[in-house]
Design a protein with these regions (language model features):
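Generic preference for hydrophobic/aromatic residues in regular secondary structure cores
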Residues: 7-14, 80-87, 178
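Cysteine protease-like catalytic core of ubiquitin/ubiquitin-like
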Residues: 25-113
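Conserved active-site-adjacent core of cysteine acyl-enzyme catalytic domains
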Residues: 1-36
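Generic secondary-structure transition motif, activating predominantly at the C-termini of alpha-helices
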Residues: 2-6, 77-81, 128, 142-143, ...
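C-terminal folded domains that constitute the principal catalytic or ligand-binding module
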Residues: 81-156
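Disordered regulatory segments flanking catalytic cores
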Residues: 143-179
């Protein structure tokens, strides 16, 4: 995100759910957060965006509201929003996919170029495999350091099959900060 001229101006960084910025938010601003605390490896990435007017937006590729994951998220977006906040309620990502970080990047890249949240969500179809490939391809073209989607997907499915858990994965918190 730092390498993108449209994002670097307002990108605050990448954070675990329990270490979100406590200082006053400047507007516009954005960040990527993991739903896990700093003591866990990380399981799912989401994005926050605060408009120039002080409205807050929460983007989750599974379409969940902030309080689904953490009271910290709800407090953060409420504190950071001067007026109101909203979230996307449409599931976009495949259940066994592990490209949630790419969805967060996709959202912020488009949002930082002025595209509204609803318009970004409308880019996607009901075909989650198509959506997953689209965001991965988008990110891979712009940020070549992102790994191979097929390998990531196979690894995630194998790990989930062993644990019998829904689609989640682990990443390091700094994975997306230099893009």
């Amino acid at each position: 995100m730092k390498s993108d001229p449209m994002s670097r101006k307002c990108f605050l960084g990448v954070f675990p759910s329990d270490v979100l910025p406590s200082k006053t938010i400047c507007y516009p601003s954005c960040l990527i957060a993991n739903v896990d605390s700093q003591y866990l490896p990380g399981s799912h990435w989401v994005a926050f965006y605060f408009t120039a007017l002080g409205n807050g937006e929460f983007f989750d590729s599974y379409g969940n509201p902030p309080d689904f994951y953490s009271d910290d998220f709800t407090r953060f977006i409420s504190r950071g929003s001067q007026n109101k906040w909203t979230y996307n309620s449409t599931p976009l990502q495949g259940e066994f996919s592990n490209v949630c970080g790419e969805y967060a990047i996709f959202f912020l890249q488009h949002r930082n170029r002025g595209m509204p949240l609803t318009q970004i969500v409308n880019i996607f179809t009901k075909n989650t495999l198509h959506n997953d490939r689209m965001v991965w391809t988008f990110c891979k073209k712009r940020f070549p350091r992102i790994g191979d989607m097929e390998t990531q997907h196979r690894t995630a499915v194998n790990q989930m099959a062993k644990k019998k858990q829904p689609g989640r994965h682990t990443d390091s918190y700094n994975a997306y900060i230099d893009f």
